[in-house]
Amino acid sequence: MSASPSPSITGLLLAGGRATRMDGADKGLQLLDGTPLALHVLRRLSPQVDETLISANRNADRYAELGAPFDARIVADETADFPGPLAGLLAGMRAARAPLVACAPCDTPYLPADLIARLHAALDAQQADIAMAVTVDAQHARSPQPTFALLRTSLADDLAAALAAGERKVRAWYARHKTVEVEFRDERAFYNANSWHELAALARR
């Protein structure tokens, strides 16, 4: 999609976490095949949305540089204690110019090219508040992927209240709203790097 004065979907790259399992390193800036993970994701996410935001609580200048080719804006959490992806999601919902926000984490370089289209179709068909990706493996086991989702920005005030009340679990907050699950059979598309070992594994895939 191309940017427009009244976009319909805002893409949100979630890059604001602590990365405790990577010794605090900024995950989105780690290299895969010589390219920062965040840039891999931006190249796949941005063509699917009308505007792009990057949720980043540190290294904002570096993320702004990576996001420049996509006219991406940087947003930071409203709180300084790294309360998790819900805080990044809230910052994105507040900053979005569109009525819908599509989020994806910064360490998933193979996300599907049809991710947003499929989430949007399900959201509309079910008149849901949230559409969330779920992977299904060869044994039909389902694995929810809550940070791959499409949400209505009208939920921002409720999310702010939930965060203020201490909620930190993404799926627990989703459960308060009408959420539709969208199945994806390509597990590889959702592989991520939560640790140095997983980053090395990504490079071998």
From Swiss-Prot:
GO terms for cellular component: cytoplasm. Its EC number is 2.7.7.77. SUPFAM superfamilies: Nucleotide-diphospho-sugar transferases. It is found in: Cytoplasm. It catalyses: Mo-molybdopterin + GTP + H(+) = Mo-molybdopterin guanine dinucleotide + diphosphate. Keywords: Cytoplasm, GTP-binding, Magnesium, Metal-binding, Molybdenum cofactor biosynthesis, Nucleotide-binding, Transferase. It is an enzyme of class 2 (transferase). The N-terminal domain determines nucleotide recognition and specific binding, while the C-terminal domain determines the specific binding to the target protein. Transfers a GMP moiety from GTP to Mo-molybdopterin (Mo-MPT) cofactor (Moco or molybdenum cofactor) to form Mo-molybdopterin guanine dinucleotide (Mo-MGD) cofactor. PANTHER family: MOLYBDENUM COFACTOR GUANYLYLTRANSFERASE. Belongs to the MobA family. HAMAP family: MobA. This is Molybdenum cofactor guanylyltransferase. It comes from Burkholderia ambifaria (strain MC40-6). The gene is mobA.
